[in-house]
């Protein structure tokens, strides 16, 4: 089977790290051991610097919504061109913690940036490049935020209002409903059931890939 790009998406506290472990276990059970892990924003020296700016901001300066989204796409194109595409070209599988869907949901939905601008940014920066599979971990924002707060200090985005995350979730669900490559997982279940749901969805997808 050719190398694939699998992305894990979701709000804060959705359990992306646990989901990644489940994805890796399923892939390795299928004999897929050459796996590259990525996270967004980040993954290259420049992208990591941009991540710090996006997450923490700069004292005394307001980070505008458009500046935020432009930095996210700058970080993304660095990661895609320098890490993800080369990994796929040499036959590695790539498992990503977030990708473009995050920007479409957080900045397009949460921030309310015009959908045409968001689509234009995606198409200009990424062209036709898309993940082969996205696992979207869905849960009520209040639940996810409670989990995030329990982990400790919140970053700039995690400190946004509940209404912001409600809008973000709504956009996630809207986009997932219109794209067959996005599989929605109920992340409000107990962790064992979430892992089982991910395993089932991924195993079925892998079977379908072998049949193509």
From Swiss-Prot:
Its EC number is 2.7.4.9. ATP binds at residues 10-17. One of its GO terms (cellular component) is cytosol. GO terms for molecular function: ATP binding; dTMP kinase activity. Signal peptide: none annotated. GO terms for biological process: dTDP biosynthetic process; dTTP biosynthetic process; dUDP biosynthetic process. The keyword ATP-binding applies. PROSITE patterns: THYMIDYLATE_KINASE (PS01331). SUPFAM superfamilies: P-loop containing nucleoside triphosphate hydrolases. InterPro entries: P-loop_NTPase, Thymidylate_kin-like_dom, Thymidylate_kin_CS, Thymidylate_kinase. Keywords: ATP-binding, Kinase, Nucleotide biosynthesis, Nucleotide-binding, Transferase. HAMAP family: Thymidylate_kinase (MF_00165). Phosphorylation of dTMP to form dTDP in both de novo and salvage pathways of dTTP synthesis. Belongs to the thymidylate kinase family. This is Thymidylate kinase. It comes from Yersinia pseudotuberculosis serotype O:1b (strain IP 31758).
């Amino acid at each position: 089977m050719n190398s694939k790009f699998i992305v894990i998406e979701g709000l804060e506290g959705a359990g992306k790290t646990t989901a990644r472990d489940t994805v890796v276990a399923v892939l390795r059970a299928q004999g897929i051991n050459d796996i590259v892990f990525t996270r967004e924003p980040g993954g290259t020296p420049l992208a990591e610097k941009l991540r710090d700016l996006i997450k923490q901001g700069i004292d005394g300066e307001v980070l505008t919504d458009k500046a935020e989204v432009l930095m996210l796409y700058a970080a993304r194109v660095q990661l895609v061109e320098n890490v993800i595409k080369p990994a796929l070209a040499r036959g590695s599988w790539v498992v990503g913690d977030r990708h473009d869907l995050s920007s479409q949901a957080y900045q397009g939905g949460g921030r309310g940036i015009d959908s045409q601008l968001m689509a234009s940014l995606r198409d200009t920066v990424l062209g036709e490049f898309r993940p082969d599979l996205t696992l979207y971990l869905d849960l009520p924002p209040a639940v996810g935020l409670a989990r995030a707060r329990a982990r400790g200090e919140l970053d700039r985005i995690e400190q946004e209002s509940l209404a912001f995350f409600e809008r973000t979730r709504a956009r996630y669900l809207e986009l997932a409903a219109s794209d067959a490559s996005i599989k929605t997982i109920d992340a409000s279940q107990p962790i064992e059931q979430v892992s089982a749901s991910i395993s089932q969805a991924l195993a079925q997808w892998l079977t379908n890939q072998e049949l193509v």
